[in-house]
């Protein structure tokens, strides 16, 4: 799943992927400067909880879903 966020004309990409062989979920946030923040979790419930935290943090910083 991919979401795009916008803030003052800058774009941020938020991606969730699932590795079927390992079972891990990965959250990758690509910042406007091209740098990435990567987190991995094992369980779907962890993924949901962490995604809510990350998205709320982005919204709190002024990012809006594009």
Question: Which stretches of residues belong to each language-model region?
Answer:
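Short N-terminal "domain-start" leader segments
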Residues: 1-25
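Hydrophobic alpha-helical segments and their boundary regions
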Residues: 12, 23, 40-41, 51
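Surface loops and adjacent helix of pleckstrin homology
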Residues: 17, 30, 52
């Amino acid at each position: 799943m991919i979401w795009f966020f916008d803030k003052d004309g800058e774009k941020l990409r938020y991606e969730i992927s699932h590795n079927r062989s390992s079972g891990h979920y990965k959250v990758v946030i690509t910042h406007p400067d091209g740098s990435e923040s990567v987190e991995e979790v094992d369980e779907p419930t962890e993924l949901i909880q962490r995604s809510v935290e990350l998205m709320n943090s982005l919204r709190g910083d002024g990012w809006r879903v594009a």
